[in-house]
Design a protein with these regions (language model features):
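Compact, well-ordered interaction domains used in eukaryotic information-processing assemblies
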Residues: 18-23, 41-45
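Intrinsically disordered, low-complexity domain-flanking/linker segments in eukaryotic proteins
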Residues: 27-41
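Internal, well-folded beta-alpha domain core
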Residues: 38-42, 46-149
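N-terminal ordered "arm"
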Residues: 1-22
Length: 149
């Protein structure tokens, strides 16, 4: 069963809203090292979205998603420092994963996400792993949440 990692989902939602991610962390960490105080920091997307109430529902049959693997060579000579300069790359991905993501609209950030997805607007185009595996995001609507006892 392939589970959609919550932090990965927050990263995708943060990309839609234009929040900074892990690439900003290198700058933050190097600045803190220079100042002599290294404390824990999180990317902007996580700081802003960590409190969202989210449900992730797998839609593939029994939650099983097939995995594809591709192996290719990069033999330009400078790709690898090993003798011969041949870099063997093994890439793997999930084939046609499907999840239904439910977000409780109880805060401003959740409402921003709803508006962005509903209006097909995003700051950074979301993708799953590599930029040739774009996320196909559909807005399904708003439903009333009910408490179950």
């Amino acid at each position: 069963m392939a589970i959609f990692h919550r932090v990965a989902l927050l990263g995708i939602l943060g990309a839609i809203l234009g929040y900074k991610g892990y690439s900003q962390m290198q700058d933050i960490l190097s600045n803190k090292k220079k100042k002599g105080k290294l404390e824990s920091s999180y990317p902007e997307f996580y700081e802003k979205l960590k409190d969202l109430k989210i449900a992730i529902l797998p839609l593939n049959n029994k939650g099983i998603i097939s995995k594809k693997i591709q192996i290719f060579n990069n033999s330009v000579g400078y790709a690898s420092k090993e003798q011969g300069g041949n870099l063997i790359v093994k890439e793997q991905w999930l084939e046609n994963p499907k999840w239904e993501i439910c977000i409780l609209l109880d805060c401003e950030e959740a409402k921003k996400i709803k508006e962005a997805i509903q209006n097909h607007k995003c700051e950074f185009y979301p993708y799953l792993g590599t930029n040739d595996h774009f996320a196909d995001i559909e807005y399904l609507g708003v439903e009333e949440a009910k408490t179950i006892e």
